[in-house]
């Protein structure tokens, strides 16, 4: 694709431990299109989080990589914080417990945008308001342990976009939250991606969650890319039995008709 933000070609990752090597990703060919919302779907151990970490340059030291990731939109490997933001699954461990919320967000803006501390702190307050945190001026001076799980994840999102990146990677950002807060966080991410013109890579095990907002879906299983395509096509006409089973597992009495029913 000529408008690819990132292009993976024959990309593989294995983890070395105790003299053995276990494959996490195997020969992945995948383009991430600039401006799209791409959902990476898979069960635990599918390699989806390894993909997110690889794109962010955050693989651990015992990772053995082959193949290639190219960045046509940048011409160079993107700079963490500046060119891409990363939202982790566990907001609690992502935040520094001894720094205030405002300090943590302002630090990103100060470092990457060259703002003075006063200006950066003002941007932190604006971002807290932007991610729909009530009383942002009070939360600015709060510490992570004083916030709810949903509020902490909003703070992490604010920090991830503080330097105005064009690429946002969200690795299972809702899995530790209740259903209502999950929907709120997804809605917030949708809004931010649209308003700021970002590309979103959203990693999740929940294909039903992704079905509501993704432009494209890529399904992973056992380190392999099972199928990828426009969300409507994957959801209504899955090519692989595994994808069909993921869809079927979410169709029950408590789930609105997802997918194939919508095409009927």
Regions found by a protein language model. Name each.
Residues 60-61, 72-85, 103, 111, ...:
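ABC ATPase NBD coupling module
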Residues 142-147, 151:
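Conserved ABC ATPase signature
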Residues 162-166:
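A short, proline-enriched helix->beta-strand linker immediately N-terminal to the Walker B motif
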